[in-house]
């Protein structure tokens, strides 16, 4: 088998292996994804972004149907978690995906739609050279799922369930200092209510920062199928919605903007009328080829 091309990129240090596969010709199994994301025996990443046309993924049987708003000729982000499981959406991943298309010369438009399993995600590429990019992603509908609680190290953290195309439990802990937040042991999976989240959930721990021109928070996240990551795009949207909700914000009606700091950097989240937009950076740092023999072995 021929070598398989790849790139490596990250959005606020949420890192990905990018597989350019416009014809959806690669057999991308869970074991291959997990091997690629292995930080000792593979390239190492939080997840894999396959770059393909939506119609080709449909023809190959990767998709059973085109998601809402996604056309056959749209670029589609076939996103996989680091353990090989399929995920609906990744906000940081969409930024890296759109940046890659610009850097590779596959897409010259600055405004277009990226398909995902959570539906069509319009993007605006503000800048994108060979290394650095800045992208805004229209994240779509933000829906409140109701109050719930996460548990960690014997402590309960009240939060609110938020759907951003994938499920989140955002816990705003105003009494936690920045140092306290940094000391939380997220090597251990937090507990949650499986009745509310039967498919698992991404859990955010959020600390509001002193109010400036716009609300700002610090956030750490435990992603289902991955563990703690340096950033989570949909998680930052959930965190922003939760901290505004705590102040009386009506998710389906009001508008507001929050700057969210994560261990890997910072992004801006805007919410209006139940919709969200995420703006942040992207970095493409390496390109290479996977040995065909290694690919076949996994």
Q: Language model features by range: what are they?
A:
Residues 140-142, 266:
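Short, solvent-exposed aromatic-acidic interface loops
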Residues 143-147, 285-287:
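Short, charged/polar, Gly/Pro-enriched secondary-structure boundary elements
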Residues 141, 163, 221-223:
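Non-cytosolic beta-sheet module surface loops
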Residues 145-147, 154-158, 189-192, 202:
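Glycine-rich, charged/polar anion/phosphate-binding loops
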Residues 150-182:
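Internal active-site segments that recognize and position negatively charged phosphoryl groups
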Residues 131-140:
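Short, solvent-exposed secondary-structure boundary/capping segments
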Residues 1-131, 170-298:
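A glycine-rich beta-to-alpha transition motif near the start of alpha/beta enzyme domains, typified by
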Residues 10, 61-64, 148-153, 157:
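Short, charged N-terminal helix-start/capping segments
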